[in-house]
């Protein structure tokens, strides 16, 4: 109950809102105690990172991984069957813990969602249910960060990138965020959300959160961001 699935991959696997392949897995960890210290949150992050690395020790790329502070990125090798299609060379697992001085300002709405592997759906469609149990491919339930938060995170990231001198190159590397936001915009529920006061309030809270984090650029105006100049 202290680990949350988030990001674009959760939009696909947990909510069925987008259709794209991703080699990234984003997780958020929280002790559940808003009075806990930053160190306690970092310790939880470290424990989870170590567990994931040890569980997949045969493919873990320790030399590439970043394992310090409240943000950790673990890399894992995999056999890439398809060549030249823009796939990353490694699987990435990003784990973020809360480092806000005042956790009362946290904005991480979450839901319990069922995750079903693609191969599980395929095996069910061809009547091979016994293989699902044989290989441990059953669906499972996990906590996921609500898409409303994911939308705000993606907007915030694109805004910050657009202020850089090499904005075009940086934004090109995050074109998946543009795709995700476009898909959500064309979903009636989230289109309504994007035109609501709730969205403005959520963006404000995310900006406050950014302002309390290290290396923040939340002072940059959202409305005046270069990415919106021709909008």
Residue ranges of model-derived segments:
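Glycine-rich beta-strand-to-loop/alpha-helix junction loops that act as flexible
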Residues: 5-9
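Structured mid-to-C-terminal alpha-helical surface segments
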Residues: 1-3, 13-19, 30-231
């Amino acid at each position: 109950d202290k680990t949350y699935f988030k990001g674009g991959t959760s939009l696909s696997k947990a909510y069925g809102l987008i259709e794209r392949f991703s080699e990234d897995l984003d997780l958020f960890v929280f002790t559940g105690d808003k009075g806990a210290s930053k160190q306690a949150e970092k310790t939880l992050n470290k424990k989870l990172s170590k567990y994931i690395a040890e569980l997949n020790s045969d493919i873990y790329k320790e030399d590439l991984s970043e394992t310090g502070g409240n943000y950790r990125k673990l890399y894992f090798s995999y056999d890439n069957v398809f060549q030249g299609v823009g796939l990353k060379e490694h699987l990435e697992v990003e784990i973020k813990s809360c480092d806000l001085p005042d956790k009362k300002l946290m904005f991480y709405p979450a839901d319990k969602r069922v995750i079903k592997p693609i191969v599980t759906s395929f095996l069910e469609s061809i009547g091979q249910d016994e293989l699902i149990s044989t290989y441990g491919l059953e669906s499972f339930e996990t906590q996921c960060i609500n898409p409303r938060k994911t939308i705000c995170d993606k907007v915030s990231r694109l805004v910050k990138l657009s202020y850089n001198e090499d904005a075009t190159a940086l934004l090109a590397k995050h074109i998946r965020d543009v795709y995700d936001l476009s898909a959500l915009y064309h979903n009636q529920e989230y289109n309504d959300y994007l035109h609501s006061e709730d969205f403005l309030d959520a963006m404000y809270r995310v900006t406050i959160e950014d302002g309390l984090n290290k290396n923040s650029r939340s002072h940059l105006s959202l409305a005046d961001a270069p990415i919106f100049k021709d909008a």
